[in-house]
Amino acid sequence: MAPAMGNELQHRTVLLEEAVQALVTRADGVYVDGTFGRGGHSRLVLEKLGESGRLIAFDKDPLAIATAQQITDPRFGIVHESFASLRTAMAERGVGRVSGVLLDLGVSSPQVDDPERGFSFRADGPLDMRMDPTRGESAADWLARATVQELTEVIRDYGEERFAFQIAKALVARRAESDRLGPLVSTGELAQIVANVVKTREKGKDPATRTFQAIRIHINQELAELQVVLEAALSLLEQGGRLVVISFHSLEDRIVKRFMQAHASTPAVDRRLPIRAVDLPSPPLKIIGRVFASDAEVAANPRARSAVMRVAERIAP
């Protein structure tokens, strides 16, 4: 197994033991780590697997892929794609069913801590925000063309920012000055534009937090891809297989919670119809529960404070 790299030393995997314990129910199973990151969960899963077990991991980030490629364990494979391609990737590998799917959502510490990636408002850097900088539209490119309405909707819906319209107008006004000032291409300037608009302050939170989150989610299509992978995971899980999802903000957690609840409930029917409960199809999932980081983990890793892990098990064939 590969030694830790510098970025791995900086990255503390949240809910490491709890997630792997919930995920791995059989040592000979086929498991999916939808978000390899720097490999914390994947390495522990491999420790739990027997010789016939298998782990397939996904990540968009080229740096994560480079780390994963150092793992020479024959039971391990890495896919340089979004976890939204889960169904296709499994079909290409001849995998019909899996024993568990783990998703550790959001941005990783190495991504946030590297100003060159453009995720952070705390250090100036290029306004990129792509999980995979080699594909798709950067944040700067999108901000250079988005309308006030588009900006407002993204910042409001994905950032839950009540000053979304005012921020959108300020961004478009800044764009009108591009001939004189040049294009908006730095995280520092974006953060300052937002700070000039958001006059009220949330305790312990930078005024740019919500806007940066919103733009990042939009650029990477995070919520849409989450919906896709949840459906794919449900279709691939074998009976007794586990779906384990760690989320870090309410938008993600709400999607996961509603998905699990919807598939753990018996369909509602009109009570006036002559249908017996035993005639209704069994729900495919059973909700195992949710887990929060311990006080000790939060003290050691403040990022864990907002983490919520939800676990469900496939009970119907």
Swiss-Prot record:
Keywords: Cytoplasm, Methyltransferase, rRNA processing, S-adenosyl-L-methionine, Transferase. It is an enzyme of class 2 (transferase). Its EC number is 2.1.1.199. The lineage of its organism: Bacteria, Pseudomonadati, Pseudomonadota, Betaproteobacteria, Burkholderiales. S-adenosyl-L-methionine binds at residues 39-41, 59, 83, 104, 111. The keyword Transferase applies. Its main location: cytoplasm. It catalyses: cytidine(1402) in 16S rRNA + S-adenosyl-L-methionine = N(4)-methylcytidine(1402) in 16S rRNA + S-adenosyl-L-homocysteine + H(+). Transmembrane segments: none annotated. This is Ribosomal RNA small subunit methyltransferase H. GO terms for biological process: rRNA base methylation. It is found in: Cytoplasm. Gene3D superfamilies: Putative methyltransferase TM0872, insert domain (1.10.150.170), Vaccinia Virus protein VP39 (3.40.50.150). InterPro entries: RsmH, SAM-dep_MeTrfase_MraW_recog, SAM-dependent_MTases_sf. It comes from Paraburkholderia xenovorans (strain LB400). It holds the Pfam family Methyltransf_5. GO terms for cellular component: cytoplasm. GO terms for molecular function: rRNA (cytosine-N4-)-methyltransferase activity. Belongs to the methyltransferase superfamily. RsmH family. Specifically methylates the N4 position of cytidine in position 1402 (C1402) of 16S rRNA.
